[in-house]
Regions:
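Short, basic/low-complexity N-terminal boundary segments at the transition from targeting/disordered tails
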Residues: 13, 22, 34-36
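Beta-rich carbohydrate-recognition and catalytic domains
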Residues: 27-220, 225-286, 300-345
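Active-site pocket scaffolds in enzymes
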Residues: 293
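Bacterial N-terminal signal peptides
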Residues: 9-19
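Positively charged n-region of N-terminal signal peptides that target proteins for export
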Residues: 1-6
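Conserved glycosyltransferase catalytic-site signature
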Residues: 290
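Sec/Tat signal peptide C-region and signal peptidase I cleavage site
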Residues: 20-26
Length: 345
């Protein structure tokens, strides 16, 4: 998340704790994707006390016929917080959606960013997951009432010794456990778990489940169950040879198992989502060459983070290429766009 925009890295090969997908897997989940994209749908909006220059890291769930979106925002001083937006099902009013700034909610002043929102069905509560130095959570009975989120709490008493750096936290559960995934901005992809009945308490010591070169497994992870396949996918943000952001994908047959590369999506020319497999809708200029922190629109809104391959959509952050190259990172004017799957095989 907080990296120099003009980082240039020759992306090199990866080391995984697993093997590439075999024939049985290839029949259930595609390994090659192409997308179409909108222009910017959501741009930074300010008020009398918030001079916002970027909106980023969106997490969206469908609730009461509309999209509930929590996102990071960045002010003119380069400081991070979060905001809430409520958007029509077809995003037709996204451009005019008025943000609620989360630092107006008690306990949310200062650095809180990179949200994930979901309904935790076993407790009939909504959870907001985010980072504030530590991974934190808050609960609510109604995600459309951002002023009612509880005081943030830490998942851990302190940073575990097994972790050198942690960023971009994501929770997903199966029927037995809840898992906390995150990146390290260092090429490592981490996992911790707790019995589903203990959530949000009792997460064990995180372990590394996949590794690569720093910029080939960087940050911005999001993890999903793929409907009808028995497969899980993890999308992780990478940097291309000129610093462009794109997503690669890992897969696993269970959340606690081995994670392996999905086809050739680990390469900049053949990503899960990136400049080489996205075309913009008719009349829309190529407004970004970076497809950065965001996530797929899930089916439903609960802790299983389920997606359907027949209608994938990815809400991402992008930026004018010249502004992105100029940087520094905390002052890039990110906006939100929506990519829709065009084809896959």
């Amino acid at each position: 998340m907080k990296s120099l925009a003009n980082l240039a890295a020759a992306v090199c090969g990866m080391l995984f704790f697993g093997v590439l997908a075999g024939p049985a897997f290839a029949q259930s989940v595609p390994t090659s994707y192409s997308w179409t994209s909108t222009g910017p749908l959501i741009s930074p909006k300010s008020d009398s006390t918030h001079n916002i220059i970027a909106v980023k890291d969106p997490s969206a769930v469908f609730f009461n016929g509309r999209w509930v979106i929590y996102a990071s925002d960045v002010n003119s001083a380069g400081n991070y917080n979060m905001e809430y937006l409520n958007v029509a099902a077809d995003f037709s009013d996204a451009a005019t959606a008025k943000p609620y700034f989360m630092d107006n909610t008690p306990g949310f002043s200062g650095y809180h960013t990179a949200p994930q929102v979901f309904f935790f069905a076993p407790q009939k509560k909504w959870y907001l997951i985010f980072q504030s130095g530590q991974p934190q959570f808050s609960t609510n009975s109604d995600p459309t009432k951002p002023q009612n989120w509880t005081q943030p709490k830490n998942f851990y008493a302190s940073q575990p010794s097994s972790v050198s750096n942690w960023i971009d936290f994501w929770v997903i559960c199966d029927t037995v456990k809840c898992y906390l995934f995150f990146n390290g901005d260092n090429g490592n992809f981490y996992r911790a778990s707790t019995p589903i009945g203990n959530f949000p308490n009792g997460f064990n010591t995180p372990v590394i489940v996949a590794s690569s070169s720093q910029f080939n497994m960087f940050e911005g992870d999001n993890v999903y169950s793929v409907e009808g396949t028995g497969v899980y996918i993890a999308n992780i943000e990478c940097l291309g040879p000129n610093g462009q952001r794109y997503f690669r994908t890992l897969w696993a047959s269970n959340l606690g198992g081995t994670w392996s590369s999905l086809g050739n999506t680990d390469n900049f020319p053949t990503p899960f989502l990136g400049q080489d497999n996205v075309t913009f809708n008719s009349g829309v200029s190529a407004w970004t060459t970076s497809f950065s922190s965001g996530g797929l629109l899930i089916d439903g809104n609960d802790q299983t983070d389920s997606v359907n391959l027949s209608h994938l959509k990815f809400l991402y952050q992008g930026s004018n290429p010249a502004a992105y190259a100029k940087g520094p990172y905390n002052f890039i004017p990110w906006q939100l766009g929506l990519a829709t799957l065009k084809s896959s095989h």
